[in-house]
């Protein structure tokens, strides 16, 4: 009884104390054009004066975080409260009204969902005239104002790449769960994606004010489905034990936090003794939560064990600062896989957001505390820290030096350190946006040094240099100009014509067009792009509009690399491929409404693949014609055969290269090449003509082969599960200076295309099966329904849709269902933890799920119990499935899916699909 608690506290002379979340006194609108201030909705955003002009940034006081979750879990709603309480906005935006700061695209406001990630910067605790202090901080960290660079990410599965490229540059994340739905399918997907990048995460259980919210059940699902030990830092506070949700009980500080007032700024704090007087049940549960928290930490952190013994083995006597330090150590050491701190709240009711912000500052890492970024330079891979120390350059130079001509160790070290001194800044372009007024905006995370306004940036992926005329600090759709973007910060470079997602940008002290060797080869780990599975034709309204349409498509692809454009050689149609139906719908809206392309998009179709049924035999082709006014002549031999990663024999160990691309294996044989390494670390051969090194040969042969594999010989779909063996003979295929990269690529494409055609007309042997067959995307599908709908949904998947049920469980751990891009890194054996038994996890009881319920409500609870179906289903059968699922589950079912693999069709199914595609086959 909250009112009784307040009254008793006053009667005893212990007035409830307000939490010291500083009031913001010194806000100022940045100097922006009046036209900008007149924009609808813009007036709510205001900025810290310390952001403009740019000041020196303390990395210890910086947090680069993302908000990740299932769709409709409350990501944007929580973000709006964070901006409001930090003082950045004057009012709280509403998703339903379309007045949010981070969802600013017309399509986002119309649909009420996040489509593209939005970056925004604020301070927590709020800075007061550039100097923030808190009289009663939770920890030394939350006593100082921190700069928080926050990215609000989409929750829909079709925008997986938008989440991936945001996670690539983040240091920490807040995963928001719906307290009613618990851990949903898309939650598992984004959690697994964050794990591949080793990002520490905390969990915020939202919507605790809703009917059916179950904090305890959600905690147990975190353990069983996300694979970490839940560290319950807060428990929900319901008025009278089972009334409305009014606040949280803090297990770290042993206090109750009660929210009152419409905007949530009024927060009152009650000690454990005060809770004992009026909320004894809550106080007892809070003690149990503290004991469980200390016990859990003691299993993973030796220091907290020492603190426990220093406090006479009293769990309640361990200081909050010691607990926070222990939580932070466990979180950072395990990268969010061992310990998962859990908090509670109801963002829409303005409850729980300020303590969540405190936890972002207290628990999540600064840029200096994150795992060392991976880099590659001159063919040598290592960490950024090794590069900056000079050790990686020493290794690269020693590897590149010809045998017998190595310099002394001291000289190599001196050269390496001198080279590193010329590196002024290094950053990764993780997003490109075409803004109607500002032009092309390239979002950059700086990992070393700084990128300054007016400096020359060298793109090591494209080998081009561009000047950075303007630099911006973004606040969703608005921006403030800055002089530089320093290490650990996220900013925007305006006006770059060539930079793409995943490119590395380097600035050197020499400010020359090309950095000194080998800095011109420095590359940060790129961003993986998942394969598209849907496509639609795009046609201009007239021939005069065709050029404009292709220019708009090029801009669209630069913004979103998960889209793909190809040309159907038979029909001449332009095909746009994407991750899902909604993905292509949004791309169409962007193309027509924003980029003003006068074009029409056809119906959305499935991207099938073609695979060989037999081998082709070797085919040799000589290309001999002019290319761009220059005579070119080269040759190549290609041979086609089926490929299966598990059953196909290993390629020739003497191969020049073996590459897996788009599900195909390309093997390059060049037995007669005499390969040597030059002083730059590049491979050369005296047999090759000048200007053509071994890497250029590899690239030319690979590109030519990939171009041919993009179109199958029988059904015109891209090839898959195909091994192409390319053989290059210097005596038969190299013709002096006439042989260039372009002619080699053209010869390879010609040979590979002919070999593909021979699969049908001239197979390798009379016994070989001629032709190719179709492959279709087989999807990993996770469906969430209640017990009452389980039978109908399982029957529909296994019979009507030709799917295969993998598991039928209440709890499906993420490790068993990979819904993401495969992780190419070697897993840490210490983090390969066994499944967690939910029975061993502390979780507070849920007041609305009592076992003493009488009558038929127990049966009703059983029928409403959430169940999870994991299945593998052909993509064709999942098109439009959501509407059907909702009809089977009374509107409560949800699902998420991603590509598992491409699978060969049976002859009857292939015939049916071709009949549907072409009318009659």
From Swiss-Prot:
Subcellular location: Mitochondrion
Gene3D superfamilies the UniProt entry points to: 3.30.70.240, Elongation Factor G (Translational Gtpase), domain 3 (3.30.70.870), P-loop containing nucleotide triphosphate hydrolases (3.40.50.300), Translation factors (2.40.30.10)
Superkingdom assignment: Eukaryota
Coiled coil: none
Transmembrane segments: none
Stated role: Mitochondrial GTPase that mediates the disassembly of ribosomes from messenger RNA at the termination of mitochondrial protein biosynthesis. Not involved in the GTP-dependent ribosomal translocation step during translation elongation.
Family to which this protein belongs: Belongs to the TRAFAC class translation factor GTPase superfamily. Classic translation factor GTPase family. EF-G/EF-2 subfamily.
Keywords recorded for this protein, A-Z: GTP-binding, Mitochondrion, Nucleotide-binding, Protein biosynthesis, Transit peptide
InterPro entries in alphabetical order: EF-G-like_DII, EFG2, EFG_II, EFG_III, EFG_III/V, EFG_V, EFG_V-like, G_TR_CS
Transit peptide feature range: 1-55
Entry keyword annotation includes Mitochondrion: yes
Residues at which GTP binds: 69-76, 152-156, 206-209
Cellular component GO terms held in the UniProt record: mitochondrion
Xref: Pfam families: EF-G_D2, EFG_C, EFG_III, GTP_EFTU
Organism: Emericella nidulans (strain FGSC A4 / ATCC 38163 / CBS 112.46 / NRRL 194 / M139) (Aspergillus nidulans)
Name of this protein: Ribosome-releasing factor 2, mitochondrial
Example GO biological process: mitochondrial genome maintenance
GO MF term (any one): GTPase activity
Family annotation (NCBIfam families): small_GTP
Domain tr-type G: 60-368
């Amino acid at each position: 009884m909250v009112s009784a608690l307040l009254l008793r506290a006053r009667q005893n002379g212990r007035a409830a104390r307000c939490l010291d979340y500083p009031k913001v006194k010194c806000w100022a609108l940045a100097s922006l054009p009046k036209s900008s201030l007149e924009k609808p909705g813009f007036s709510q955003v205001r900025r810290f004066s310390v952001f403009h002009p740019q000041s020196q940034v303390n990395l210890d006081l910086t947090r680069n975080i993302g908000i990740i979750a299932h769709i409709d879990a409350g990501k944007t709603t929580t973000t709006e409260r964070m901006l409001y309480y930090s003082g950045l906005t004057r009012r709280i935006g509403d998703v339903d009204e379309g007045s949010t700061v981070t969802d600013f695209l017309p399509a986002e406001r119309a649909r009420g969902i996040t489509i593209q990630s939005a970056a925004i910067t604020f301070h927590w605790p709020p800075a007061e005239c550039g100097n923030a202090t808190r009289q009663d901080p939770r920890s030394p960290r939350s006593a100082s104002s921190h700069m928080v660079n926050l990215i609000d990410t989409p929750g829909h599965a079709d925008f997986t790449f938008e989440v991936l490229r945001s996670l690539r540059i983040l240091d920490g994340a807040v995963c928001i769960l719906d307290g009613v739905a618990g851990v949903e399918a898309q939650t598992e997907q984004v959690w697994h994606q964050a794990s591949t990048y080793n990002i520490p995460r905390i969990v915020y259980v939202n919507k605790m004010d809703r009917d059916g919210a179950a904090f305890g059940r959600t905690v147990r699902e975190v353990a069983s489905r996300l694979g970490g030990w839940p560290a319950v830092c807060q428990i929900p506070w319901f008025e009278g034990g089972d009334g409305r949700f009014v606040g949280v009980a803090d297990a770290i500080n042993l206090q109750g936090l009660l929210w009152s007032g419409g905007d949530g700024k009024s927060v009152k704090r009650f000690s454990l003794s005060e809770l004992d007087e009026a909320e004894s049940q809550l106080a007892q549960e809070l003690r149990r939560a503290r004991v469980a928290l200390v016990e859990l930490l003691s299993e993973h952190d030796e220091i907290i064990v020492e603190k426990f013994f220093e406090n006479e083995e009293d769990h309640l006597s361990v200081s909050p600062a010691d607990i926070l330090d222990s939580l932070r150590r466990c979180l950072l050491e395990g990268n969010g896989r061992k310990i998962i701190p859990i908090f509670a709240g109801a963002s829409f009711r303005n409850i729980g957001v300020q303590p969540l912000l405190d936890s972002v500052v207290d628990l999540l890492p600064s840029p200096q505390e994150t795992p060392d970024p991976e880099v590659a330079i001159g063919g040598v891979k290592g960490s950024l820290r090794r590069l900056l120390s000079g050790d990686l350059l020493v290794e690269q130079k020693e590897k590149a030096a010809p045998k017998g001509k190595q310099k002394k160790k001291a000289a190599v070290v001196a050269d390496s350190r001198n080279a590193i001194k010329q590196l002024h800044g290094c950053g990764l372009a993780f997003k490109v946006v075409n803004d109607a007024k500002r032009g092309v905006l390239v979002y950059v995370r700086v990992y070393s040094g700084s990128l300054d306004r007016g400096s020359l940036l060298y793109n090591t992926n494209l080998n081009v240099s561009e000047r950075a005329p303007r630099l911006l600090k973004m606040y969703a759709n608005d921006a403030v100009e800055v002089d530089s973007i320093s290490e650990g910060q996220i900013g925007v470079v305006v006006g770059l014509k060539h930079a793409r997602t995943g490119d590395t940008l380097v600035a050197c002290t020499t400010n020359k067009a090309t950095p000194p060797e080998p800095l011109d080869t420095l590359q940060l780990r790129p961003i993986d792009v998942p394969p598209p599975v849907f496509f639609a034709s795009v046609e201009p309204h007239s021939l005069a509009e065709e050029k404009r349409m292709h220019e708009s498509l090029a801009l669209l692809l630069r913004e979103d690399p998960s889209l793909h454009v190809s040309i159907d050689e038979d029909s001449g149609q332009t095909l746009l491929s994407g991750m899902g139906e909604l993905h292509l719908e949004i791309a169409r809206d962007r193309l027509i409404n924003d980029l003003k392309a006068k074009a029409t998009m056809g119906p959305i179709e499935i991207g099938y693949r073609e695979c060989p049924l037999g081998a082709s035999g070797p085919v040799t082709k000589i290309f001999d014609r002019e290319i761009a006014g220059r005579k070119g002549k080269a040759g190549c031999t290609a041979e086609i055969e089926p490929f299966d990663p598990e059953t196909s024999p290993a390629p020739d160990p003497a191969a020049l290269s073996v590459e897996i691309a788009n599900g195909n294996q390309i093997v390059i044989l060049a037995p007669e090449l005499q390969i040597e390494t030059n002083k730059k670390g590049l491979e050369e051969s005296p047999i090759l003509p000048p200007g053509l090194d071994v890497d250029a040969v590899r690239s030319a042969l690979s590109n030519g082969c990939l171009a041919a594999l993009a179109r199958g010989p029988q059904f015109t779909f891209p090839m898959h599960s195909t091994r192409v063996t390319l053989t290059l003979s210097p005596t038969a295929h190299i013709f002096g200076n006439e042989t260039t990269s372009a002619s080699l690529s053209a010869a390879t494409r010609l040979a590979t295309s002919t070999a593909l055609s021979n699969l049908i007309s001239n197979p390798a042997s009379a016994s070989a099966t001629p032709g190719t067959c179709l492959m279709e995307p087989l999807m990993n599908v996770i469906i969430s329904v209640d017990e009452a709908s389980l039978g109908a949904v399982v029957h529909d998947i296994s019979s009507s849709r030709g799917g295969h049920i993998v598991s039928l469980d209440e709890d499906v751990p993420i490790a068993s269902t990979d819904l993401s891009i495969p992780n190419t890194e070697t897993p840490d054996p210490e983090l390969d933890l066994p499944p967690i038994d939910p029975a061993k996890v502390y979780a507070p009881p849920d007041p609305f799920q009592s076992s003493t319920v009488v009558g038929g409500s127990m049966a009703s609870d059983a029928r409403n119990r959430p169940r999870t179906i994991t299945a593998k289903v052909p993509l064709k059968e999942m098109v439009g499935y959501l509407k059907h699922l909702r009809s089977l589950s009374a509107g409560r079912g949800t699902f998420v899916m991603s590509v598992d693999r491409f699978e060969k069709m049976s002859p009857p199914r292939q015939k049916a699909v071709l009949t549907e595609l072409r009318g009659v086959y």
